[in-house]
């Protein structure tokens, strides 16, 4: 398992390999396939996006739809694998420690670009994009909060504290305003849903958030010569034109959409077409409308968004069960989902293979726990009257 986690953490390209492995398991019938909302939803999204690609005569969108098929098979594998809490905790620990290596790589990357007289460079580490890198590290910080609650020794406490400092530094170096704001929202959700709240923890969390905010302000001011508010304004202003053009695309094809890579292929006809300078600067690398829900509407129309909302609705029903049962994992699951929603206002993290895999795995864990799919330890009762 560790080799597949390494492939996911260290490159968006090698992250595909574990997904292909899950396809192999499915074809050989080595995994059980349940008829649940995750499997129905992801497979339906795959079929509909493939159909949209065909109707739009887009080879790229047709091929990209198989990415959803890979998410579907990864989700099936996760449902079969994450049936024990020991496995879940083990994977979360491995992902965290490997992310430390990615964070160190990001710090080295920043130092290298400073030496090359490019201090404005935003790190992307092993995730290919600063915003996706920020989202990954923000999720890892939330995972560390959970792992701190499962610690068994004081040495683990010290280790996690050091790790969270390093990951936080790496997050700040991405300068991803969306990921940072999403993290603050995620931390808020984590602690209002946490069972074991005390004054010391609340003070510690407020201190961490305060220090991170101050550091973020300092970095934005010194490196990019702007403030977080200014960065938010710039970020929204650059996206408004994208959203306007994407909305036009949606109204042109509201049912079928333009295919998963429709924005990349046809967006130039709608987005910033009135401003050549912005058009050439932004549209050349734009693969989605920089909004989670608008991405579904443009790529797969109202049907695609409806399928996604079907998955989310049932996911929240399962999360409600976990909340009522006071499950230990619930704060983490709620916080990571909150992050997707918050950052989804200005980005679509599900287009990144590493974050997409994390999303479906967290979803599979939620489903398994809420629907009693976990393997429980059986207590063996010795009966002296029974001959062995």
Model-flagged regions — what are they?
Residues 233-237, 241-244, 259-300:
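Long extracytoplasmic/lumenal interhelical loops at the membrane interface
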């Amino acid at each position: 398992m560790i080799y597949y986690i390494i492939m996911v953490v260290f490159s968006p390209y090698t992250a595909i390999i574990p997904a292909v492995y899950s396809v192999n398991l499915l074809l050989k019938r080595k995994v059980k396939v349940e008829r649940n909302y995750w499997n129905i939803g992801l497979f339906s999204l795959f079929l509909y996006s493939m159909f949209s690609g065909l109707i739009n005569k887009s080879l790229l969108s047709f091929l990209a739809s198989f990415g959803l098929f890979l998410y579907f098979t990864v989700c099936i594998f996760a449902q079969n694998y994450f049936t024990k809490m020991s496995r879940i905790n083990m994977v979360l620990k491995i992902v965290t420690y490997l992310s430390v290596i990615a964070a160190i790589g990001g710090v080295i990357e920043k130092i290298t670009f400073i030496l090359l007289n490019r201090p404005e460079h935003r790190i992307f580490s092993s995730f290919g994009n600063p915003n996706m890198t920020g989202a990954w590290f923000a999720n890892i910080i939330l995972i560390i909060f959970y792992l701190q609650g499962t610690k068994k020794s004081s040495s683990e406490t010290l280790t996690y504290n050091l790790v969270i400092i390093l990951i936080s530094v790496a997050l700040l170096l991405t300068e991803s305003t969306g990921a940072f704001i999403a993290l603050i929202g995620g931390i808020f959700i984590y602690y209002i849903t946490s069972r074991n709240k005390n004054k010391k923890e609340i003070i510690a969390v407020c201190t961490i958030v305060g220090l991170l905010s101050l550091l973020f302000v300092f970095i934005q001011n010194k490196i990019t010569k702007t403030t977080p508010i200014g960065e938010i304004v710039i970020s929204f202003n650059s996206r408004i034109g994208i959203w306007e053009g994407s909305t036009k695309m949606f109204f042109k094809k509201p049912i079928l959409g333009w295919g998963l890579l429709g924005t990349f292929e046809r967006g130039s006809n709608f987005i910033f077409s009135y401003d050549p300078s912005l058009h050439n600067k932004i549209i050349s690398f734009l693969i989605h409308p920089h909004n989670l829900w608008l991405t579904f509407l443009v790529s797969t129309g109202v049907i695609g968004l409806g399928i996604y909302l079907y998955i989310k609705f049932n996911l929240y029903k399962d999360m409600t069960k976990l909340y009522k049962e006071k499950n230990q994992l619930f704060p983490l699951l709620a916080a990571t989902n909150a992050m997707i929603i918050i950052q989804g206002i200005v980005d679509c993290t599900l287009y990144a293979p590493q974050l997409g895999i994390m999303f479906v795995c967290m979803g599979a864990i939620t489903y398994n726990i809420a629907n009693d799919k976990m393997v429980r330890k059986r207590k063996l009762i010795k009966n002296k009257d029974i001959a062995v």
